[in-house]
């Protein structure tokens, strides 16, 4: 699903092909990332437990964020609140409004499920 389609930025659901791209890009910029993180997000998305969003910038995967409508974790886990977690923009795409747009869309998605959102 596409949540936002602007001039250079598209926000859409995480796809299987994104997992390898994000893992490789994060490792290239010095982050110690394993593909299992994205495989878990894809599994949770398929189970209906989360909405995992990806930002594309000019057609390239540039960032991600995850919404758990009824999070099980954290201080408010199990209380029916939406949680926004695991938010990142690849270094080479920063300072272009991608992170702001990802957070805006994640908040819009989260508030469909709960009046209270935590990060």
Whereabouts are the PLM-identified features?
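A short beta-loop-alpha structural element at the N-terminal edge
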Residues: 6-22
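Short coil/loop residues immediately preceding or within conserved phosphate-binding loops
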Residues: 50, 79, 84
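Active-site rim helix/loop that mediates acceptor-substrate recognition in acyltransferases
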Residues: 31-54, 64
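Conserved beta-strand in the GNAT
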Residues: 54, 60-69, 83, 88
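Conserved GNAT acetyl-CoA-binding A-motif
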Residues: 110-119
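A short, polar/charged loop-to-alpha-helix boundary motif
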Residues: 71-78
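Conserved acetyl-CoA-binding loop-helix of GNAT-fold acetyltransferases
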Residues: 89, 95-108
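Hydrophobic alpha-helical core bundles mediating ligand binding, dimerization, or RNAP-core interactions
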Residues: 19-27, 38
């Amino acid at each position: 699903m596409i949540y936002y389609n602007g001039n250079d930025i598209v926000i859409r659901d995480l796809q299987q092909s994104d997992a390898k791209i994000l893992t490789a890009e994060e490792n290239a910029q010095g982050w110690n990332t394993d593909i299992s993180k994205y495989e878990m997000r894809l599994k949770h998305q398929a189970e209906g437990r989360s909405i995992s969003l990806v930002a594309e910038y000019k057609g390239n995967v540039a960032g991600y964020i995850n919404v758990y409508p009824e999070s099980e974790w954290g201080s408010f886990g199990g209380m029916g609140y939406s949680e926004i977690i695991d938010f990142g923009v690849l270094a080479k795409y920063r300072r272009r409004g991608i992170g702001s747009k990802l957070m805006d869309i994640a908040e819009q998605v989260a508030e469909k499920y709960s009046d209270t959102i935590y990060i």
